[in-house]
Amino acid sequence: VPVTGPGLVRKSPTYLADPNFPLFMRWSYVPKLLPWLIKYLSFANESDTRRISQGLTTIVGDSLEQHKALTAQTKAAKWVQSSNYSFAYADRAAFNADAFGWQLRKEAGFIPDLIEGRAVQEEEPILGFGTQLLAVLKGHGFILNPGSYVQDLVCVLKELGGKFIQAEVKDFDLSGGKITAVDTNIGRMHCDKAIVSSGIWSKPLMQKLGLHVPLEAERGYHIVFEQPSQKPNNPMMLAAGKFVATAMDQGLRCAGIVEFGGLSEKKSKAPLQLLRRKVQEVFPKLSFASEQEWLAYRPAPTDSLPYIGELSASGVFTAFGHHHIGLTGGPKTGRLVADMIVGHHPNTDIRPFDPMRFKRGK
C-alpha cells in the first residue's frame, strides 16, 4: 500500500505541524523538492492508490518464495526467515480507520487474522497494554541480516563465475542508440547490456542517458537496540508510530519515519527522538545494552512504482525506485530484468514500471 493514499493532501499540513507524527521536512530543501512533491501528491487519490497497489503486488506478492528460490542450496539461504507479519493498533477504532489500506491488501489476497484484548500480549509479550489489536498476516518472512545476506549473494555470484567490480560510473558510451561501454574511474568497461540499479543515485546516471526521472530521496531513520531484553516473535508494523520492529541478528531494529531533505549526510535529531519515544510507548518494558542509529535514502518515484525495463532498445535496463521495498522486491525485479536481457517476454505485466513513462507524459 503506497504512502500516497486518499486524503494525504488534506492531512499533510496537520501531519507536518504535529511533532508526534512521523513526517518531517527540511524546509531549506522545499524549493528544490516542490516540483517532485506536487506530482507526488497528485497520486494521492483512490484510483491511483489502487492502481499503484496492484502494480506493487506483482513485485512483492510472492517475495518470500522469490527469496527462497534465489538462495536455494546456497550459503545465503540461512538469512531468509519465514514468519508472520503483524500490524499493531491501539484498538478496533484505529484498525477501522485504516480500512482502505486493508481493502487493498484483501484485494491482493492478504487476509488478516485479528487478535484483540489481552490475547494481544499473549501473542506478543513485548507489547504494552496500549496495543489492543493485532492484524496478523501469515506466510510472510524477513531477512535476518541484510548486510550479510547481500555479502553472501556476492560470494554465490563469484562461485558461479561472476565478477564483482566496485567502481564509480562516470558516463555511458552509446553508438547508434546502443550501449557499447560504461566509463568508470578505473577504466572503460565494454558491454552490450547494462543495468542501472543504484537506488537514489540512479537519478544522475539516468541524466547522463538523457532521461530526467522524477525521483527523490525519502530519508528513513533506523535504530538497532543491541542486546534487547525483549524481542517481538514476528516482525510488526506499529501503526501509531509508523515504524516496523524486527528481531534481527544485530538486535531489535526499529525502522520508519519519513523525512524529505535530499541527500544530506547529516542526521536530524527530531526523527530519532520521535522514534525513541514511540518505541518506549509501545514496548514499555524494553531495555537494551546499546543502540546504533542509521539513516537510509529510499528512492521515491512520484508515483511510488519502480523503474523496471529497457530504455528504448538501447541495451540499458533499469531496476531502481523501489521506495520502501527494495530488498523485498529485489529477487522478482532481478528475474524480470534477466528475462528481458535474454529476450524472454516476462509473464508479468511490466507496463506500470516503464522507465520512459514520465517522458511520455504519464
Which residues are covered by each model-predicted region?
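A conserved short coil-to-beta-strand element within the FAD-binding core of flavoproteins
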Residues: L114-E124, F142, K163-T180
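Active-site catalytic microenvironments for nucleophilic, acid-base chemistry
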Residues: Q73, V156, K208, L336, ...
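Alpha-helix/helix-capping structural signal
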Residues: A93, I200-W201, K332
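Surface-exposed helix-capping loop/turn segments at secondary-structure junctions
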Residues: A69-Q81, E159-K163, L211, F283-A289, ...
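Active-site substrate-recognition segment that forms the wall
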Residues: V1-F43, D171-I179, G187-G315
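Rossmann-like flavin
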Residues: L34-C155
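Hydrophobic/aromatic residues within well-ordered alpha-helical segments
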Residues: L56-S63, S198, P271, L275, ...
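C-terminal catalytic lobe of FAD-dependent flavoproteins
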Residues: P112, A239-A240, Q280-K362
